[in-house]
């Protein structure tokens, strides 16, 4: 019994010993400190060279003398390695510090400073200038250094030899003054992680630096930003996998700072506050609060060449004043000319949606070529932005005569009353000299033509089937509004992919009413001008030239087949899309017409329906074509599609004859802009 009790006591004492030893060891191997100023902490910072702790609590690494170095290390080594029977890893650690660099002058600055992991709390015989108080010419690049430094560099290149220094950058250095990785000094905007904000290390203002090393992933994050921001950017400047660090770090390392100046290139380097943590879970660097630190040093950078600068400023200001006077003269003359040129004529008073030319000139940045987003048969289209409005598209038209201006403006003003979700909205117009300007809503995704052909050719992105089918139904809805639902009948006369614009939600907008005509209900159209685009024009137009809603239906049918097949309606007069699809239909192979770029990514029922409706719309007899209301019911599945009768087709010879009659009589307009969209499938 006594023996068992003795064994129990021995076992208990042994376990207690193990627990206490592990606890003490954990405390001994964990390092945490925070210096919010260095007054009262002189014994904890080992300084060498030009470094000193000033009475105001600032740690100054160097003054602005030439060719000096300064180092400041925490007085105790930090245990950074974890060893077990299988491997060796580096413990997680983090550090944050606020520093200030004040150059001697704007042209005399350098060289920078480092945060360093070193096997010793000093850097014996370290060189100045490009060596930054860490290395010298003899040991530079020596793997026996066991030094890792994060370099804050302010000098481009070196006066002694060619180096990798790019100036105002952060670098990661392993045993060498040559950086393995360099990044120009920026911080990332928290509202837009892709937006970079640059700043200067030697600005004389406090800058916060945060370093975070995750031992589990071997990832090192480095973040720098002006301390005045008061918050930490969520995206670091450097986020780098650094397995090479394991070759550098020894069992115990010293942490601290080094700095140097060069010959004729010198800055004062200060550290206002510093915190460090290692040995626990992955630590997050503490952001130091600027108000809790000593005041920053005064920025006493010398103003060189003051007298010459004053002279230069006087000359420059005189030149600027002269230029401003000349510009003011021309501006007054320009305003005077504008006032004379914008006199209203009698016919313009009835159309109150007139915009000022000067506003459109400013909105389009002077109608520069860089603002062109498309061209068409009636003019050029520019992107613009009026104050307090969404972007606009401005079409600049040059009419052939003053009579043409009157008729065209009256026509456009009537069309400007059209309002439908599948039509491009006309906001207004302007007349300036012989130019007519039409102002539309700006549609960001460009034309259906570009999405069907240009975008796939450039990027390989193919318009998805679902997007195509919804676009087809949207165009049909817009044409139904023009033909039946507005107070007058509107015949578009130029329905084609380049006149269909796609908005940000992939809704189609039928636009470019340059050829459109209005008719009172119950009247017949009368025109002798044959207009439209080859491939989309109904066959009866070659006989009488009179457009009708049925000729718009024909053009829609061709457009619908083009959307499904991904092919142009005609090719050099040898291929006709409508005849090709009809031939496949007659052979029972109509699904072979579907755009092969879709692969299997389409709905067979919807595709078969769309092809059948397209063929019905292309019937050679206008009276046999369905109205747009019936077309929309077909596409929505609200009515069954009838069989195509034997009188549908016409021969290729008649088609060729029809095409030859059109040569020389056809105009074409389009607004084309290429843009990517999330609804385009790869």
Swiss-Prot record:
One of its GO terms (biological process) is response to abscisic acid. Residues 29-277 are annotated as: Legume-lectin like. Residues 1-26 form the signal peptide. ATP binds at residues 373-381, 395. It holds the Pfam family Pkinase. One of its GO terms (molecular function) is protein serine/threonine kinase activity. Residues 332-682 are cytoplasmic. The chain crosses the membrane at residues 311-331. Its EC number is 2.7.11.1. Keywords: ATP-binding, Cell membrane, Kinase, Lectin, Membrane, Nucleotide-binding, Plant defense, Receptor, Serine/threonine-protein kinase, Signal, Transferase, Transmembrane, Transmembrane helix. Strongly expressed in the vascular system and trichomes of the leaves. Also expressed in guard cells, anthers, stigmas and germinating seeds, but not found in petals or roots. Increased susceptibility to the bacteria Pseudomonas syringae, characterized by stronger necrotic symptoms and higher bacterial proliferation. SMART domains: S_TKc. Its main location: membrane. It catalyses: L-seryl-[protein] + ATP = O-phospho-L-seryl-[protein] + ADP + H(+); L-threonyl-[protein] + ATP = O-phospho-L-threonyl-[protein] + ADP + H(+). GO terms for cellular component: plasma membrane. It is a single-pass type I membrane protein. Residues 367-641 form the Protein kinase domain. The active site is at 494 (proton acceptor). In the C-terminal section; belongs to the protein kinase superfamily. Ser/Thr protein kinase family. In the N-terminal section; belongs to the leguminous lectin family. PANTHER family: PTHR27007. Involved in negative regulation of abscisic acid response in seed germination. Involved in resistance response to the pathogenic bacteria Pseudomonas syringae. This is L-type lectin-domain containing receptor kinase VI.2. It comes from Arabidopsis thaliana (Mouse-ear cress). The gene is LECRK62.
């Amino acid at each position: 019994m006594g023996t068992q009790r003795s064994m129990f006591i021995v076992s208990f004492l042994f376990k207690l010993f193990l627990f206490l030893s592990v606890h003490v060891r954990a405390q001994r191997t964990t390092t945490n400190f925070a210096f919010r100023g260095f007054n009262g902490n002189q014994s904890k910072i080992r300084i060498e060279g030009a470094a000193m702790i000033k009475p105001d609590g600032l740690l100054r690494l160097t003054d602005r003398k030439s060719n000096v170095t300064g180092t400041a290390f925490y007085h105790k080594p930090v245990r950074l390695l974890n060893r077990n029977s299988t491997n060796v890893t580096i413990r997680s650690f983090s550090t944050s510090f606020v520093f200030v660099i004040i150059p001697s002058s704007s042209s005399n600055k350098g060289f920078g400073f480092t945060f360093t992991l070193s096997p010793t709390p000093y850097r014996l015989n370290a060189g100045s200038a490009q060596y930054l108080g860490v290395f010298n010419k003899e040991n530079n690049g020596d793997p026996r250094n066991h030094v890792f430094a994060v370099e804050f560099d302010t000098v481009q290149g070196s006066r002694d030899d060619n180096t990798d220094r790019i100036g105002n950058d952060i670098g990661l250095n392993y045993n060498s003054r040559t950086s393995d990785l360099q990044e120009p000094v920026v911080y990332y905007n928290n509202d837009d992680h892709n937006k970079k904000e640059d700043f200067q290390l030697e600005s004389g203002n406090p800058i916060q630096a945060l370093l975070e090393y995750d031992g589990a992933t071997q990832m090192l994050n480095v973040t720098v930003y002006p301390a005045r921001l008061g918050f930490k950017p969520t995206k670091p400047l450097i986020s780098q996998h650094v397995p090479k660090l394991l070759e550098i770090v020894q069992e115990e390392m010293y942490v601290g700072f080094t700095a140097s100046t060069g010959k004729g290139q010198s800055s004062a380097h200060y550290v206002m506050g510093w915190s460090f943590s290692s040995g626990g879970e992955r630590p997050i660097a503490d952001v130091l609060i600027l108000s809790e630190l000593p005041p920053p040093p005064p920025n006493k950078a010398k103003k060189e060449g003051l007298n010459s600068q004053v002279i230069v400023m006087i000359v420059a200001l005189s030149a600027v004043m002269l230029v401003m006077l000349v510009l003011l003269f021309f501006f007054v003359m320009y305003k005077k000319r504008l006032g004379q040129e914008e006199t209203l004529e009698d016919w313009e008073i009835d159309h109150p949606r007139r915009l000022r030319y000067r506003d459109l000139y400013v909105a389009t940045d002077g109608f520069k070529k860089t603002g062109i987003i498309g061209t068409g048969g009636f003019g050029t289209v520019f992107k613009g932005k009026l104050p307090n409005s969404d972007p606009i598209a401005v079409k600049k038209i040059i009419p052939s005569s003053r009579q043409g201006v009157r008729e065209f403006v009256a026509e456009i003003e009537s069309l400007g009353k059209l309002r439908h979700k599948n039509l491009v909205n006309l906001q207004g117009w302007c007349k300036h000299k012989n130019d007519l300007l039409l102002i539309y809503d700006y549609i960001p995704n460009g034309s259906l033509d570009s999405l069907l052909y240009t975008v796939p050719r450039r990027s390989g992105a193919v318009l998805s089937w679902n997007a195509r089918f919804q676009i087809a139904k949207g165009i049909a809805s817009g044409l139904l509004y023009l033909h039946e639902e507005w107070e007058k009948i509107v015949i578009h006369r130029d329905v084609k992919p380049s006149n269909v614009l796609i908005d940000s939600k992939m809704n189609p907008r039928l636009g470019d009413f340059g050829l459109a005509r209005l008719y009172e209900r119950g009247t017949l159209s009368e025109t002798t001008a044959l207009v439209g685009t080859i491939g989309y024009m109904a066959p009866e137009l070659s006989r009488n030239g009179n457009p009708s809603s049925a000729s718009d239906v024909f053009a829609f049918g061709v457009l619908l087949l083009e959307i499904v097949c991904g092919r142009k309606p005609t090719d050099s007069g040898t291929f006709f899309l409508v005849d090709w699809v009809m031939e496949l239909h007659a052979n029972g192979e109509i699904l072979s017409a579907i755009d092969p770029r879709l692969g299997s990514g389409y709905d067979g029922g919807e595709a078969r329906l769309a092809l059948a409706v397209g063929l019905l719309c292309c019937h050679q007899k206008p009276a046999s074509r369905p109205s747009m209301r019936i077309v929309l019911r077909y596409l929505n599945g609200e009515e069954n599609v009838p069989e195509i009768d034997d009188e549908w087709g016409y021969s290729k010879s008649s088609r060729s004859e029809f095409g030859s009659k059109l040569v020389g009589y056809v105009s074409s307009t389009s607004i084309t802009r290429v843009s990517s969209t999330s609804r385009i499938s790869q």
